[in-house]
A protein has these predicted regions:
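C-terminal binding/interaction regions
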Residues: 8-65
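Short hydrophobic/aromatic-enriched beta-strand-loop microsegments
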Residues: 1-7
């Protein structure tokens, strides 16, 4: 599950709620300083599970088709 983020909030919550495992950054959109903040936010958080797990299970079922 990849995510394309242009700010730290999205990076944090796509990790926490969507269990994203790949982070994509636009080279022309994100400068070096912001890129470091986004990467830190992505790496500093883990998947919360719980109510979000249902969505992940649905995605995994689609991947298996």
């Amino acid at each position: 599950r990849a995510c394309c983020c242009s700010e730290a909030f999205s990076a944090e919550y796509t990790r926490r709620h969507n269990n994203a495992n790949t982070l994509c950054l636009g080279g022309r959109v994100v400068g070096p300083g912001l890129a470091c903040q986004i990467v830190d936010a992505f790496l500093d958080h883990e998947f919360e599970g719980g109510r979000h797990q249902k969505r992940i299970d649905k995605m995994m079922a689609l991947e298996a088709l």
